[in-house]
Each structure stands twice: as C-alpha cells, then as structure tokens.
Amino acid sequence: MDEPACNGTSNEWQRPQLIVAGPRAARRRQMLASLDLNTLLALEALLEHRNVTQAARHLGLSQPSVSRALIRLRGVFNDDLLVRGSSGMVPTPHAQRLGQMLPPVLDSIRGMVDPGLDQGEWRLTARMAMPDHQAIVLLPPFLPLMRERAPNLDIVTDSLLALRRLEQGEIDLAVGQIGEAPPGYFRRRLYNDRFACLLRNGHPALEQESIIDTFSALRHAAIASDTKDGFGRVHDDLVKLDLQDPDPVLVSNVLTAGLAIVSTDLVLVVPRRVATRNAALLPLVIVDPPVELPPYEVALIWHERCHRDPDHRWLRQEIAAAATATEQGQSTDAASRQ
C-alpha cells in the first residue's frame, strides 16, 4: 500500500498534486487563446442566420471579415461547423452542440456590461427603512405595482431609519423626514403633507362650532416613535401654544393609536395621508388642527454606492410613482370634501 506523500522535514500528510499536461491540455489552451469575444459573437450570428452575408449585416461587419471569422472558428473547433445544403448552410452536429452552449455564455458576458435585469425575473429582496406611519401610506399603492411588474421581488420594511445601515448595505432605501442629504447620500422628495386631527365618530368635540375651543382640554395620544422619525416636533409646538397636554398617551404605532381613539375620547395629530388611511379602516373623523402647522415632507434616501445601479434606480422610480399616486388620492379626497 502506498504511503501518503510527505516532505522531508514534517510527518504531516500532503495532498498529492494533480498535474494536467499532455497534448490534450496543450490543445485546450491553444483553443482558448484563439477565441475572443468578437469570434464568439460571429459564431452566434452565423448559427442564427446560417448565411455569411446576413450574419455580417447583423454584426455590422463586412462579409470578408465574417468569412475570415468562420475560417478561424473551423480551425479552433476542428470542425466545418456550417456546410452547404440544398437550401443554404447547415450546421454540423458539433455546431448544434455549440449553439446550445453559447447563449448562456454570451448572456453572462452581456450581463457584465449591462447589469440591468428584467424586473419580471427578479428573485431579490429589497430592504427599506420605513416607519409604520409611512408604510401604511406608501405600501398600498406600491405593492400592487410590484406584484404586476416584479412579482418575485420581496419587500421587507424596517421601522428604524439609520443612515449607517444604508452605507453598510444592510438596507437599500430609507423613507422619512430628512431635510438635507448628508455627504455621500442622495435625497428625492416623495410628497408634502399637512397635519390633521383624528377623533372617533361621535366625539363630543365634534358638536362644538370650533374645535379650537375644546382642543386644549382634550386628552391626546402620540406615537412613541415620533421623536425618532421627526413629526414629534408638532407635539412640542402644540404644547408651547397650550393646545396639547405635555404628557400624552403613548402608543406603539399608528394602527394601535387608531384603535385606542375609537374606544376613547383621545385625539391624535398625524399627517393627513396617515389620517386618511386610518379613517378608511376605522370609524374615525378627520378634522383640521386648530392652528396652522408646518408642512410635513417625506423623502427617499439612498447611499451613493447604489446611485448608478440600474435596478436600484428602477426601484426608486417605482417608489416615487407610488408616492405620486398618494398625492393624486389626496387631491381626489380634497375635491370630494368641497
């Protein structure tokens, strides 16, 4: 029985090295050295058209150039590849095998040059940082678009908005209130919104001629994540105007707040799009706040590492289209109230 190979200074076993040599290996190296991308493209065109003149026209080359490429291909593969038949050139059996192997090779090379994919063939997961009160606004119009245009794309939303996670590639996009994009990031405005108040249907305050007379006396609800997202400052503004109690009832998210308001006399101040979504699901009434509040702007943020990626660019455009749909919906709602 043969002993394991070992060196002269150690008893450790070493894996024997397999050395590929001989005429066949040399022939393979010579064939690879003789092939280039232009030659493979010529082979593709010749197998498709089975006519040197038509293949040359397809490639934008002269007929003699394609004829020379065919001669070179015959030498590389040691096969005629295309022979004359009664109705034109006919591929040999070896050419037919090459015709089956060639498309995925060239498709891979083309993908290196143009990495954009057909979104209908996507099998990817897009991760977006999006607070829940933005998710209930954007996802209803966005998800049907994705189901139609990119049915295999998975969407995962995260409530945390963190620029560091964008930079490290943990998430792809972030949606929220960002005034200016920091260095290394890009920003696109999605929509502007104004604030509204949510009360339960039948709330005693709705019987008053002006809600401002009772607004400051009402018990308020607030979203616990407001201070992290940005519109918590509206709560502070109302407190300064003595229009909101300084210690509101904190709830974890917008839908929970809506359920709390339905069964109590609490009032919640949120962006109007959020209020509209909640009122569509629950017996709630939307009223204007007692004073004019600063507008609420929602933006899309991404890191520069993804800025030129064609798939990422496509996804950003689809999110912007969904945001535009919410603006059109707001216009329709406003017209119906007039």
UniProtKB/Swiss-Prot annotation:
InterPro entries: LysR-type_TF, LysR_subst-bd, Tscrpt_reg_HTH_LysR, WH-like_DNA-bd_sf, WH_DNA-bd_sf
Record-level Gene Ontology MF annotations: DNA binding; DNA-binding transcription factor activity
Pfam (any one): LysR_substrate
Key word Ligase present: no
Keywords tagged on the record: Activator, DNA-binding, Nodulation, Plasmid, Transcription, Transcription regulation
Entry annotated with the keyword DNA-binding: yes
Its job: Transcriptional activator that regulates the expression of genes involved in symbiosis. Among other targets it acts on the nolWBTUV operon.
Annotated family: Belongs to the LysR transcriptional regulatory family.
Record-given protein name: HTH-type transcriptional regulator SyrM 1
Species name: Sinorhizobium fredii (strain NBRC 101917 / NGR234)
